Amino acid sequence: MKAASNSVSSAGGSVSPTTTQPPLPPGQSSHPQIYDQQMQYYFAAAMPNQPMATYAAQNGSSQQYAPAAPYYQDANGQYVQVPANGSMAPQQHMMVSGQPYLYMAQPQQGAQQVMQSGQPQLIYYQQSMAPQAAPMYFHPMQAAPMLPEQMGVMPHTQPAIPPQQQPRQVGVEISSTRTAPLTSSTPLPTSLEYETVQRDNRNRNIQFRYHRVMEHDELPIDEISKITLDNHNDDTMSAEKENHFHEHRGEKFGRRGFPIPETDSQQPPNYKTRLCMMHASGIKPCDMGARCKFAHGLKELRATDAPARYPNNKYKTKLCKNFARGGTGFCPYGLRCEFVHPTDKEFQNIPPYQRMSHDDQDYDQDVIPEDYVVARHQPRFMRTGGRATTPTKVMLKHRNVAGSMMCLSNAGRDLQAGGDYNQPESNEDDLPPHLRRNRRENPPMNKRRTSLSTKWTSEENLGLRGHY
């Protein structure tokens, strides 16, 4: 305690020479106190049993004050002033945050000490107290600077107190040394305790998530027995396909700017908007029957609800190649064909040289065209030798959307050296303009065209040296 008094005197200023210094408190030579500059935390020894007089320096003047009223320590560890009449006054907490108090034991002599300005206040207690261990406070995460006189002081040994058995969580261990700030009663966990608690929390969360996943994955046996193949028959699959079709149809109409039709009706928008060709022909009944999406008569024919198509500027402006020269006279598209057919009123605007000849029409009327039928052609070229060769049109298996790709072949052609061909008599009006002019008997063949044209009546593609 002597070292602490000297340090206080040196820090606060010089003491008046006329004033007698108080002697050392009893029983404190073996229990030193360590004082830091911030005056926030301190070490204290056991309190004595004898009454202690209280001396306090309230200001920095050199005047001497009389002993103050005694104090006592309540259950919370706070020191409360005891009034003179002995009655219990309202509790007055002497420990105030921000004020430098240093609690010391009672001196042996009753001399008073006058403190200079800037010195810490020394408070002595007169209330008799039972010997008890004072709390030990440490500066958290910061070591207090020690004075030179304190370097060789031995630490104080606190009396052993049996710890109370308290229920704690599994895996959490409490250290014997509790570190806490002065204004807090809850000890801070050490690094070992913190790591133990974090590890237990992680293990608990992993097990909780695992059990939740298992609960969702497990299905009762009763629900599994209800899942059979009967729930997914053809009717349900077809209904799912129809719903999928209506959803995509509504999305397409919405992207194109048209109003989305109602999805109440399960039929497509063009249902029964055209006549069934099989039923209208009257040859045989329609194989589809009631499932046919085309109208079987005018009673079933209804107006279309589908939005109108954008107009085609080239609609019905060119002759269909199936009805041109060398055509089969049959169009697989029928009424859906966008080219001119002989039954259309636009057929009058087609030049005669582009139309099918009358001989082709008369001959092809008796021929029922099929997908793989070889369409016969009228013999155009006659040999002077007497035997006629018949160029035939061979339809390929791979057809395009415009019609069958056909090539000409001269089957059984037996040409002799020096033979010539004679063209049958024909009207010049039926010829195209580039063939109406007078041509030489033997035109040069050095500039023969070898393009893959679809004009099946072109003599240049045949490789013949004749002319019309």
From Swiss-Prot:
Posttranslational modification: Phosphorylation on Ser-458 by par-1 promotes localization of the protein to the anterior cytoplasm of the zygote. Phosphorylation by mbk-1 appears to be required for subsequent phosphorylation by plk-1.
PANTHER family per UniProt: CCCH ZINC FINGER/TIS11-RELATED (PTHR12547), PROTEIN TIS11 (PTHR12547:SF18)
Bias kind Low complexity: ranges: 1-19
One annotated Gene Ontology cellular component of this protein: P granule
Keywords of the record: Cytoplasm, Developmental protein, DNA-binding, Metal-binding, Phosphoprotein, Repeat, RNA-binding, Zinc, Zinc-finger
BP terms from Gene Ontology: regulation of protein localization
GO molecular function list: DNA binding; mRNA 3'-UTR binding; poly-pyrimidine tract binding; protein domain specific binding; protein kinase binding; zinc ion binding
Zinc fingers classed as C3H1-type: ranges: 270-299, 314-344
Residue ranges, annotated region (Disordered): 1-32, 243-269, 414-468
Residues recorded as bearing Phosphoserine in the entry: 458
Basic and acidic residues bias locations: 243-254
Subcellular locations according to the entry: Cytoplasm
Effect on the protein of changing residue 186 to D/E: Phosphomimetic mutant which severely abolishes interaction with plk-1 and plk-2
Gene3D superfamilies, sorted: Zinc finger, CCCH-type
Protein name, as recorded: Zinc finger protein mex-5
Modified residues annotated as Phosphothreonine in this record: 186
Tree of life domain: Eukaryota
Purpose of the protein: Functions with mex-6 to affect embryonic viability, establish soma germline asymmetry in embryos and establish plk-1, pie-1, mex-1, and pos-1 asymmetry in embryos. Also affects formation of intestinal cells. Binds to mRNA in vitro, and inhibits pgl-3-mediated P-granule formation, probably by competing with pgl-3 for binding to mRNA. Required for neg-1 expression in anterior blastomeres during embryogenesis.
Tissue specificity remark: Asymmetrically localized to the anterior of the zygote before mitotic division, then differentially distributed to the somatic blastomere precursor cells.
Species this protein is from: Caenorhabditis elegans
Effects seen without this gene: RNAi-mediated knockdown reduces the expression of pie-1 in P2 blastomeres. Abolishes neg-1 expression in anterior blastomeres. RNAi-mediated knockdown in mex-6 pk440 mutant background causes a loss in plk-1 asymmetric distribution during the first embryonic cell divisions.
Compositionally biased intervals (Polar residues): 451-460
Binding partners and assembly: Interacts (when phosphorylated on Thr-186) with plk-1 (via POLO box domain) and plk-2 (via POLO box domain).
SUPFAM superfamilies according to UniProt: CCCH zinc finger
